[in-house]
């Protein structure tokens, strides 16, 4: 058989396999096939990026940079996601979003996304999904949408089908660098009707030499100068296990369990200088500062799925999810000689804060196929959520004796019971695809103070949350879509906690128990185009919110800077996101992720307003060098970001990676280097209050270099293979996906 016929046969086989997979509901989420045909291997690889009108999927395992990067590094590449210089994450232009892991909400990840993703190696993740219009099936919380992290499960051949092949795959990975060291392991496999997956990791990060300096000038001429250099240590560990068993041809049961621990030790010795105004000739003081944080999270779930027809288009899923997330924070402040200090009271202190969030979730989802082109989803959900906070304040004597200060201590409990029901209809009519849904959530909330000042209260409220989307396939490889959603944000325990943190003698911070649920509206228009060498996705969005929760600061009568939260902001946001994936040459790929937005923020209650443009640009060039060396070079550039009381300056840094597979592609070696434009990443912030102006400079030692080794093992063939210097199959599969018009297949 000549070469031309071999290529033709390979293409036909790939198309047949993809067509077959689209008409069959599999337990695995993969439609990739790898088979041998008389020494000819046919490989169809998933696209690096799959764009839909209401969801974007970034295939992390297909990106060569994942071998040497963290999940946070990969998020900088993901469309609709922005990561700033302080590792703060926004999704769809909002810092309020929910993090799911393998399709299930994870409170630990949602509470600490930056810290966790910065410690988590990217090779533990299969896909990152950005669901900008989650629809009625998902919880209404999270104004930016849902960030779903799909963990890597190297599925063996036959998993989820009738072929009950036994086997396993796995890998062990280790990273050593100037700032972090980590080790991780993954194993997954199948024994008869049982499939299993387990992973674990440990990361230790050390960052020394971070500096914070600011000057605060008040209307009366009082001036405060502050300088702090700190060292930070962050240990992080995580383990997950999942099991699935096929009870019969129409039903299966699965269970998952995960444990995550996160710690942070922060040490510094700030120096504070006061002068002018009420401070006269002035004075200065220094103090030793220590902060210890420990966070542990456990989550477990069990799911039962039952199909009601052999086509598996009608099915019921019953689910239970449990999660708990306790956090302990200890703050120590010990002052130097304070004999010359006047005007403010200084004394050694210790504060201990314990919080715990616990959730029980029960859910039932039913999917019914009305016809070959229409589908109806409906279901119900109940969440029992309890948040406890115990904050204690201790005065420390000269001999280090600790005495509880009950007047400044507080203990309270916040409970939420949420009952939800939804219905969602999806249809596909030729080139048109549509989805309409509605969700209603009723919340019963109660706050009870066990100790400290505060009034117990009960309240209940309901939220009707509509969603809709419409898509049209203009031509093969080209579509356009529009979607609308209403999202809500319930204030968490951090915002509600009315405990007053007095660890800083010149400032206090506290939460607000009177916060209301935030309601945000978002309208997006999406355009997708791609051919065998070029992909373009553009999203135009407009969002508005009239009761956004903002953190704001003001000076009180005692000249203390108060920082708290309130539903005080009205926001309007117009945005454009552009993603380009261009196969310039056979071995050269260029990627661009550009986000541009205009924000208008106003607060009638505070009398403040601010507005301005900001942009974030990621440009990435991937090149295959001789000897199959994979080389990447890229840059992240962000402009000034505006908030209600000021702005944060832009930033820029560069990175490069070099990867090589050896030992019959069982061992991957990857080298990564990242550096800002200066020796440290410089971040400047300006805050303007009614009676003060503050300018802050933060310098972060961001420069990193690391080496990663990954050993792959197993007794089955890998189902997923990296496409070498060719993304033709990526776009072929994506072109088939776009013709579904948004209808799941």
What residue ranges belong to the model's regions?
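N-terminal periplasmic accessory domains that precede
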Residues: 71-74, 114-115, 130, 142-172
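Face-selective signature of the C-terminal outer-membrane beta-barrel domain
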Residues: 240-246, 250-262, 289-448, 473, ...
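Surface-exposed extracellular loop regions of Gram-negative outer-membrane beta-barrel proteins
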Residues: 150-169, 207-215, 225-226, 236-241, 444-446, 476-521, 542-562, 676-690, ...
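Outer-membrane beta-barrel signature, preferentially recognizing the C-terminal barrel domain
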Residues: 410-416, 459, 488-537, 544, ...
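Short, acidic, small-residue-rich periplasmic hinge/interaction motif at the N-terminus
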Residues: 23-64, 84-86, 92-96, 131-133
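Outer membrane beta-barrel strand-and-loop segments of large Gram-negative receptors
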Residues: 227, 359-361, 405-410, 510-512, ...
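Short acidic/polar hinge/loop motifs at secondary-structure boundaries
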Residues: 71, 77, 105-132
């Amino acid at each position: 058989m000549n070469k031309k016929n071999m290529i033709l046969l390979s293409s036909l086989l790939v198309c047949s396999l993809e067509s077959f997979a689209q008409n069959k509901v599999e337990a695995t989420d993969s439609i990739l096939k790898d088979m041998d045909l008389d020494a000819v291997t046919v490989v169809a690889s998933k696209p690096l990026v799959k764009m839909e009108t209401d969801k974007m999927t970034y295939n992390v395992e297909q990106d060569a940079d994942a071998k040497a990067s963290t999940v946070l590094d990969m998020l900088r590449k993901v469309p609709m996601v922005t990561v700033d210089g302080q590792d703060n994450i926004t999704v769809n232009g909002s810092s309020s979003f929910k993090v799911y892991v393998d399709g299930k909400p994870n409170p630990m990840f949602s509470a600490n996304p930056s810290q966790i993703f910065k410690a988590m190696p990217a090779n533990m993740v299969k896909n990152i999904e950005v669901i900008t219009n989650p629809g009625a099936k998902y919880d209404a919380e999270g104004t930016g949408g849902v960030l779903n992290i799909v963990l890597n499960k190297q599925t063996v051949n036959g998993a989820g089908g009738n072929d009950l092949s036994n086997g396993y795959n796995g890998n062990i990975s280790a990273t050593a660098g100037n700032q972090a060291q980590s080790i991780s392991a993954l194993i997954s496999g199948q024994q008869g009707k049982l499939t299993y997956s387990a992973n674990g990791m440990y990361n230790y990060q050390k960052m020394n030499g971070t500096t914070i300096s600011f000057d605060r000038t008040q209307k009366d001429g009082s001036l405060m100068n502050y300088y702090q250099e700190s060292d930070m240590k962050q240990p992080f560990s995580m383990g997950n296990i999942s099991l699935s068993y096929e009870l019969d041809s129409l039903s299966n049961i699965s269970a998952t369990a995960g444990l995550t621990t996160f710690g942070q030790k922060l040490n510094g010795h700030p120096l504070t200088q006061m002068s002018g105004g009420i401070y006269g000739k002035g004075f200065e003081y220094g103090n030793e500062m220590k902060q210890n944080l420990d966070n542990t999270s456990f989550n477990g779930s069990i799911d039962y799925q039952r199909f009601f027809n052999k086509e598996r288009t009608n099915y019921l899923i019953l689910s239970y999810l449990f999660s708990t997330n306790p956090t302990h924070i200890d703050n120590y402040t010990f002052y130097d000689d304070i004999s010359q200090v006047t005007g403010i009271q200084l004394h050694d202190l210790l504060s201990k804060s314990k919080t715990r969030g616990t959730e029980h979730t029960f859910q039932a989802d039913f999917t019914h196929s009305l016809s070959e082109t229409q589908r109806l989803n409906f279901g119900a959900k109940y969440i029992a959520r309890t948040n406890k906070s115990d904050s204690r304040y201790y005065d420390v004597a000269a001999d280090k004796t600790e005495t509880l200060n009950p007047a400044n201590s507080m203990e309270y409990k916040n409970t939420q019971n949420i009952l939800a029901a939804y219905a969602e209809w999806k249809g596909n009519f030729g080139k048109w695809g549509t989805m309409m849904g509605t969700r209603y959530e009723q919340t019963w909330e109660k706050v009870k103070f066990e100790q400290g000042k505060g009034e117990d209260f009960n309240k209940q409220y309901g939220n009707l949350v509509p969603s809709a989307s419409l898509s049209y396939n203009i031509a093969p490889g080209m579509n356009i879509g529009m979607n609308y959603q209403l999202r809500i944000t319930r204030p968490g325990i951090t915002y509600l906690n009315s405990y007053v943190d007095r660890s800083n003698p010149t400032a206090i911070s506290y939460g607000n128990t009177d916060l209301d649920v935030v309601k945000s509206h978002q309208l997006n228009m999406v355009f997708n185009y791609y051919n065998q060498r070029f992909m373009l996705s553009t999203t135009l969005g407009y969002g508005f919110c009239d009761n956004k929760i903002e953190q704001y600061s003001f000076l009180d009568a005692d000249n203390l800077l108060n920082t708290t939260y309130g539903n005080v902001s009205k926001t309007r946001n117009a945005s454009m996101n552009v993603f380009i994936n261009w196969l310039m040459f056979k071995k050269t790929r260029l990627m661009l992720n550009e986000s541009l937005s205009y924000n208008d923020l106003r607060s009638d209650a505070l009398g403040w307003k601010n507005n301005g443009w900001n942009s974030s640009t990621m440009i990435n060039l991937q090149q295959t060098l001789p000897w199959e060396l994979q080389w990447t070079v890229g840059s992240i550039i962000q402009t000034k970001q505006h908030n209600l009381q000021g702005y944060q300056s832009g930033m820029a840094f560069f990175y490069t990676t070099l990867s090589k597979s050896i030992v019959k592609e069982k061992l991957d070696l990857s080298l990564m280097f990242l550096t800002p434009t200066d020796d440290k990443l410089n971040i400047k912030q300006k805050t303007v209050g009614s009676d003060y102006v503050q300018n802050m400079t933060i310098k972060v030692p961001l420069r990193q270099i690391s080496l990663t080794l990954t050993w792959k093992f197993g007794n089955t063939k890998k189902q997923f293979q990296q496409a070498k210097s060719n993304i033709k199959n990526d776009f072929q599969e994506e072109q088939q996906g776009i013709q579904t018009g948004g209808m799941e297949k």
